[in-house]
Amino acid sequence: MFMNTQNSQATEVSSEEESQKKLEELVALAKEQGFITYEEINEILPMSFDTPEQIDQVLIFLTGMDIQVLNQIDVERQKEKKKEAKELEGLARRTEGTPDDPVRMYLKEMGTVPLLTREEEVEISKRIEKAQVQIERIILRFRYSAKEAISIAHYLISGKERFDKIISEKEVEDKTHFLKLLPKLITLLKEEDTYLENLLLSLKQPDLSKQEAAKLNDSLEKCRIRTQAYLRCFHCRHNVTEDFGEVVFKAYDSFLHLEQQINDLKVRAERNKFAAAKLAAAKRKLYKREVAAGRTLEEFKKDVRMLQRWMDKSQEAKKEMVESNLRLVISIAKKYTNRGLSFLDLIQEGNMGLMKAVEKFEYRRGYKFSTYATWWIRQAVTRAIADQARTIRIPVHMIETINKVLRGAKKLMMETGKEPTPEELAEELGLTPDRVREIYKIAQHPISLQAEVGEGSESSFGDFLEDTAVESPAEATGYSMLKDKMKEVLKTLTDRERFVLIHRFGLLDGKPKTLEEVGSAFNVTRERIRQIEAKALRKMRHPIRSKQLRAFLDLLEEEKTGTSKVKSLKSK
């Protein structure tokens, strides 16, 4: 009996020691990682920890030591966040500039924004959707919306407005059938609007009883409901409905100004008859505007305050969605660097694509927002590169053709190990060699003559181009020396011989003359001039004279070659 008790005590001691060791191991792992997961706690703790109370004590102990206990999903999310933060940090380090460089600051700031889970994306999308429903409901209460809708409907029927820009194609499948129904819808809306105006005018009658007023108000509310139902049948896009809201806000400013005017006139009307007359006119003006809006002043103010509140909620939710996905824009934009746009411009264009994605995202389809937004961001970036990167704009379809040719060239180069010829590339892509050459020529980027050669250089490309219109200093010096030497050699001839050679070869004015022209100057025959010329040339060929001029033959040959090159370039 004594032995059994002793054994059980020893077992308890060893169990406590094991528990202590496991707990120390748990703490060491948590400190090393900065956290501990529930899965790791279950693996490390001994089997003796099998009650909820014991597990709770361990969790309380870890919490007391400021150790976070996380789910495995949270750990994966933290790892993903750290990985992206490191990528952004590396990208920021690679970005040139000073510590206050805008790219560096932007990337650093983006690293602090947390990513959204699928559930959070859905929650934000629901908030946006709810806000949009409320915004539409409030805007459609005003008579302005009916007038704007009728005006747009006429533009659609006449073809002056694009159907897909105004009407939600998600709601309207058959465009032709919808356009046929539009005239009837316009008629119904006009009838309801006229009826609504008559009800509003009737409510302002001074001798109206309470029962009649209640009946008119009931009819007015029903008319408003029918009008809103007809307006929803137009299936306008949300951005079009928000444009109706701009008309409401503009009218609201006018209402407030008129209200202020009436309040000022009320104070002055007690002492001034003219002010009293102005007050009556202002009240009539206010009444007309209330009828035009379909709302009283108090209803108008209440609706606008509510409209502004829902618009703010919508913008806040959209901003949250955009800011949480800015890192996605950066990761896509960095793949399109060195394409003619700066990194900041690429980010800016990508952000515009991201905002469009937020507007058009449909969470009910089940896919993640990042998957959907990627296509909008890519489209915005590639379209910006096509439109802005080149001095001479190339159409988008041509950009796609160029990319196709470049991909084909890269593929052939990897297969053969050499740059493919236009013929090989044409065979691979199913094009003609001439078409491939034409595409290569279009793909070349024009370079500005004022562009700098290297960073911080004061030289430009234009400085390195030869000006063919200006004579080179070397040639000018050579010709000057040739002219002087020619004068010296010609002085060794007789006056008549020198005169004949100068005029026959145009050495004076660059215009050679015929034998007859030179002969008329001497009043001799052309045959006699030919004889004098032949004799003079024989003298010029004498080694004593020709030796002095032979050194200039190279200069003449260079001039001849250069002229032929210029002519060939011009012909091309």
From Swiss-Prot:
Region of interest (Sigma-70 factor domain-2), ranges: 321-391
UniProt-listed Gene3D superfamilies: RNA Polymerase Primary Sigma Factor (1.10.601.10), Sigma-70 factor, region 1.1 (1.10.220.120), Winged helix-like DNA-binding domain superfamily/Winged helix DNA-binding domain (1.10.10.10)
Keywords for this protein: Cytoplasm, DNA-binding, Sigma factor, Transcription, Transcription regulation
InterPro entries, per database record: RNA_pol_sigma-70_dom, RNA_pol_sigma70, RNA_pol_sigma70_r1_2, RNA_pol_sigma70_r2, RNA_pol_sigma70_r3, RNA_pol_sigma70_r4, RNA_pol_sigma_70_r1_1, RNA_pol_sigma_70_r1_1_sf
Superkingdom field: Bacteria
GO biological process, one term: DNA-templated transcription initiation
Statement: the UniProt record of this protein carries the keyword Signal: no
A Pfam family it matches: Sigma70_r1_2
DNA-binding region in chain numbering: 515-534
GO cellular component term, pick one: cytoplasm
Signal sequence residues: none
Residues that span the membrane, as ranges: none
Sequence segments annotated as region (Sigma-70 factor domain-3): 400-476
Region of interest (Sigma-70 factor domain-4), ranges: 489-542
Example GO molecular function: sigma factor activity
UniProt motif (Interaction with polymerase core subunit RpoC) ranges: 345-348
Similarity remark: Belongs to the sigma-70 factor family. RpoD/SigA subfamily.
HAMAP family: Sigma70_RpoD_SigA (MF_00963)
Subunit-structure text: Interacts transiently with the RNA polymerase catalytic core.
Function description: Sigma factors are initiation factors that promote the attachment of RNA polymerase to specific initiation sites and are then released. This sigma factor is the primary sigma factor during exponential growth.
Protein name, per record: RNA polymerase sigma factor SigA
Organism: Chlamydia pneumoniae (Chlamydophila pneumoniae)
Gene that encodes it: sigA
